């Protein structure tokens, strides 16, 4: 099962903007889920993380109803969604519910992700909506977490900003090459065209997602 988590700096966009992700993966044999989440400033980033945890629990428990395998859940996220994908990979699922597997998420891929929240706390145009505290930054930054067991693939476009390029390398440095065996910069892709490539069979990001799904 593929769960795709959209971006938008935790404060904009909607699952309806990202339905284009599904057809190519369905054609390859995957069941696809594109969940929504509430947006800042109406809720906090921490609340969004908890919403996504609840969404993944639901996916795990209902996967077979949609032809999916609850033991083969892959999460892919873009931008803020990549942050959420990394948070879900790091989740201690047995503390969420005793009947859940330790590795509910079997693998994840972050596209143009944000893994250290401190620079965002210091950006006034974002902090107005995100309202991050120093303590929240520590709780919400995957780059500060112990490396998870399952694999994480990190991708960014060569034509993205230096900060997105830095974050992509940061998660490899933090979690190491065993956990992050793929850390790549894709030529000819910016923050938006790299996402479109996820839905394009033959594109690197699409092929890597299929690998995580066990379909390549």
Give residue spans per PLM region:
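Alpha/beta-hydrolase superfamily serine-hydrolase fold, recognizing
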Residues: 1-216
């Amino acid at each position: 099962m593929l769960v795709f988590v959209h971006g938008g700096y935790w404060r904009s966009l909607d699952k309806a903007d990202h339905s284009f992700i599904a057809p190519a993966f369905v054609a390859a044999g995957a069941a696809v889920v594109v969940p929504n989440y509430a947006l800042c400033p109406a809720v906090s980033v921490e609340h969004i993380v908890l919403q996504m945890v609840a969404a993944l629990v639901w996916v795990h428990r209902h996967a077979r109803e949609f032809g999916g395998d609850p033991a083969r859940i892959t999460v892919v996220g873009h931008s803020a969604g990549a942050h959420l994908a990394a948070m879900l990979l790091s989740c201690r699922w047995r503390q969420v519910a005793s009947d859940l597997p330790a590795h509910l998420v079997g693998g994840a891929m972050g596209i143009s992700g944000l893994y250290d929240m401190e620079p965002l706390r210091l950006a006034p145009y974002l902090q107005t909506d995100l309202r991050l505290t120093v303590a929240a930054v520590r709780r919400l930054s995957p780059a500060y977490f112990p490396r998870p067991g399952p694999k994480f693939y990190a991708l960014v476009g060569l034509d993205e900003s230096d900060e997105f390029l830095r974050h992509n390398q940061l998660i490899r440095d933090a979690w190491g090459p065993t956990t992050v065996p793929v850390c790549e910069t894709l030529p000819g892709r910016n923050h938006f065209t790299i996402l479109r490539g996820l839905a394009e069979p033959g594109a690197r990001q699409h092929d890597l997602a299929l690998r995580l799904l066990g379909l390549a």
